[in-house]
């Protein structure tokens, strides 16, 4: 792990004067089925916000044909396009090549092959648990069939099994309580303590294997109005010895890039973190908050 001081030299030139913003390590472009934003637009927005670097992490969810959008990347085309942009903008901003990898137990052989063939091509891989029994909790139909409590229990149980099986294949666990964003009764049903056993099992896998936990500020824009995961989960990860936190807006549009980062920075300090982590070539670099 590389620690960078707060006085470390900028990671990209062309940024003069004024404070630089935290690197956004979770954002989407038109390569993701649920975004219409060209990668170039996100990059230009980041430059205007004085970010030294960003990590583009478009969706790659194998076996997601049941979704309305296409979440499976043409990996060679994706990598080629981002490498071209990385070179084009090298004097203005550092572009890290990432991916948000959808984890499902029944595609274990595919995930093994993906990591063998493409793992070294990325700077950063987010591991995400999105789907439950070929349903996306984003859609109300999932909750209508099972209810909020049962749906969340199943989500966290599956997430633990996925984290345990696939932790060698990712660097940071994305939006750990993702499903709680969309559960209709989240305000009354969901809390860390209500699902402590399942959530702690996930955090233990991450902490014991040196994996990062993502602070996803997209939750600030959800009905819950808090980051994902919940503050108590961030505190528990720290108590368990977890030290790597990645920060991402989950922006699918340029106006959401870096959303809530000042708020997240102060919150993470209150949770006991002094650094956040950026990945380059799959290696962690810790930056003072």
List the model feature ranges, each with a label.
Residues 22-24, 53-55, 94-98, 123-126, ...:
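Structural preference for beta-strand elements that scaffold enzyme active sites
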Residues 15-113, 117, 182-193, 217, ...:
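An N-terminally biased module of ancient metal coordination in phosphate/nucleic-acid-related enzymes
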Residues 57, 128, 176, 216, ...:
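Conserved residues at the C-terminal ends of beta-strands
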Residues 2-9, 13-27, 39, 133, ...:
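Charged catalytic cores and adjacent phosphate/nucleic-acid-binding surfaces used
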Residues 68, 73-208:
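Extended substrate/RNA-proximal surfaces in nucleic-acid metabolism proteins
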């Amino acid at each position: 792990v590389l620690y960078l001081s707060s006085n470390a030299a900028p990671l990209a030139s062309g940024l003069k004067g004024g404070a630089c913003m935290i690197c956004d390590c979770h954002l989407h472009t038109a390569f993701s089925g649920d975004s219409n934003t060209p990668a170039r637009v996100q990059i230009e927005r980041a430059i205007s916000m004085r970010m030294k670097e960003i990590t583009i992490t478009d969706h790659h969810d194998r076996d997601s044909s049941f979704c309305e959008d296409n979440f499976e990347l043409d990996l060679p085309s994706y990598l080629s396009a981002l490498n071209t942009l990385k070179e084009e903008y090298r004097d203005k901003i550092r572009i890290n090549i990432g991916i948000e990898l959808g984890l499902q137990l029944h595609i274990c052989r595919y995930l093994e092959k993906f990591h063998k063939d493409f793992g070294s091509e990325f700077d950063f891989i987010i591991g995400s648990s999105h789907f439950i029994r070929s349903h996306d909790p984003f859609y109300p139909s999932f909750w209508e069939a099972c209810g909020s409590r049962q749906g969340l229990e199943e989500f966290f149980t599956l997430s633990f099994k996925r984290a345990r099986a696939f932790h060698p294949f990712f660097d940071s666990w994305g939006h750990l309580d993702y499903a709680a964003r969309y559960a209709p009764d989240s305000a009354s049903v969901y809390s860390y303590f209500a699902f402590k056993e399942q959530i702690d099992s996930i955090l233990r896998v991450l902490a014991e294997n040196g994996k990062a936990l993502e602070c996803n500020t997209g939750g600030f824009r959800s009905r819950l109005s808090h980051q994902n995961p919940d503050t108590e989960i961030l505190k528990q990860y720290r108590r368990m010895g977890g030290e790597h936190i990645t920060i991402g807006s989950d922006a699918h549009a340029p106006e959401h890039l870096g959303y809530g980062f000042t708020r997240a920075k102060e919150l993470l300090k209150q949770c006991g973190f002094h650094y956040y982590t950026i990945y380059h070539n799959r290696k962690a670099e810790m930056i003072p908050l």
